[in-house]
Amino acid sequence: MTHWTHPTEFRQEVRAGRFRGQTAGQCPGYTQGNLAILPRECSEEFLRFARLNPKSCPLIGVTEPGSSRVPELGDIDLKTDLPSYWVFRDGHRAEQVNDLTDLWRDDLVGFVIGCSYSFEDALRDAGVPVRHIDEGRGAPMFITDIANGQAGRFGGRMVVSMRPMTAAQAIRAIQVTSRFPSVHGAPVHLGDPAQIGIADIERPDFGEPMALKPGEIPVFWACGVTPQQAIRSAALPFAITHEPGHMLVTELRNSHLAAF
């Protein structure tokens, strides 16, 4: 897979339909985002949901109703700048599309949510390997039994991403990722996956499977795929999200998100 270094060039490839893959490892140093697009009539409700669940839904950008632009994150058009989208109807995933131009409506509001792909550069700089990047695959993600804070129709369960590492690396990972609350921050769990309702660590709900090597433990971070579970629970007539792993690459630098 080709790797790009600057988000403007990368998004041009996406807009032109030349890149449709997962975005882990693309444009090191720049923030990636999850996406949820909802009708205006439920946007305030979803905003309350995000504020109730900041670990899973750290907002980094919100559009004006009807606009697909997020100027604070760069020269971005949400209709065309992600490699793959999922369309939900009545709470169920109905289709996958690569462009939203024909689906866009004047009442839609876009929410960009920080993604843990953004702190992976800092992990690697600190000597913590990120195996899904090294192996060229997507991070495994799991639906847990951790209930989200309920806001009106929006609830569901938390989704987590998993990265395998040694116990010593996990300690370092906690130190590093605690600096980045805008992209999920510190892990929510490490060790026994059954304690958060994950029955089989080698069968993720999203992403790609990744077996633990001897001496490794699973480390779990809250994930921006969580809003998709909230959309399912709300049974909205219409909503759009990114396909898990296929993120919006912004022009916001990760270093600007560090809390300390």
Curated annotation (Swiss-Prot):
Protein name, as recorded: Putative hydro-lyase Daci_4977
Family stated for the protein in its record: Belongs to the D-glutamate cyclase family.
Alphabetized UniProt keyword annotations: Lyase
Source organism: Delftia acidovorans (strain DSM 14801 / SPH-1)
Top-level taxon: Bacteria
InterPro entries (UniProt xref): D-Glu_cyclase, Putative_hydro-lyase, UPF0317
NCBIfam families: PRK05463.1
Xref: Pfam families: D-Glu_cyclase
EC number annotated for this UniProt entry: 4.2.1.-
Any one GO MF annotation of this record: lyase activity
